[in-house]
Regions:
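ADP-ribose/adenylate-binding Rossmann-like module
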Residues: 74-78, 85-110
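Short, polar loop motifs at secondary-structure junctions
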Residues: 41-46, 63-64, 83
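NAD(P)-binding Rossmann-fold cofactor-contacting core
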Residues: 33-51
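Glycine-rich adenosine-cofactor-binding loop
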Residues: 5-26, 133
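Glycine-rich, highly charged phosphate/nucleotide-binding loops
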Residues: 53-70
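Adenosine-phosphate binding glycine-rich loop
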Residues: 8, 116-149
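A short, basic/flexible loop-to-alpha-helix module at the beginning of a structural domain
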Residues: 1-9, 111-112
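Residue-level detector of alpha-helix initiation sites
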Residues: 20-22, 83, 128
């Protein structure tokens, strides 16, 4: 069972394995909270390439190897290959925060939908049961809590 928790990522090393759409979404979300994001993937999206060019992320063009996640505080497995995502999880020590983008129950953290308005943060999670519902709830909350909050 997951408990909502706010965490300071500013000094945490984040490694994202994968360079596609899901990895891009996770990276985009995390950039507001840390500048220590390292991506490992044979290819990356245009958006990730732009982040690399503007020095917002670091990148290794390669296939995953267990040593890629050594010394990481947060690891996200976001490839389109479940066996690689599973290998990422297997390479981690128990104290690492791990998100398995393909199967949330194989990780120990998830990414809820959230709304941020200055000091107000509202997160919504369906524990993976209905991501569309979570998105709809956040959309409704955006209408209620506009940029003035």
């Amino acid at each position: 069972m997951n408990m909502p928790l706010m965490i300071d990522l500013s000094n945490k090393k984040v490694v994202i394995v994968g360079g596609g759409k899901v990895a891009t979404r996770r990276t985009t979300s995390l950039l507001a909270y840390t500048n220590h994001i390292h991506v490992v993937s044979p290819t990356i999206t245009d958006t990730l390439q732009k982040y690399l060019e503007t020095k917002q992320i670091t990148y290794e063009k390669k296939h995953f190897e267990p040593q890629d996640v050594e010394n990481a505080d947060v690891v996200i497995a976001a490839t389109n290959q479940s066996d690689v995502n599973n290998d990422v999880g297997a390479a981690l020590s128990k104290n690492v925060l791990f998100n398995h983008a393909g199967q949330a129950d194989l990780g120990n953290i998830t990414f809820p939908n959230f709304l941020k308005r200055d000091k107000l943060t509202i997160s919504v999670s369906t524990d993976g049961a209905s991501p569309k519902l979570g998105q709809r709830i956040i959309k409704d909350l955006k209408d209620t809590y506009n940029e003035d909050y």
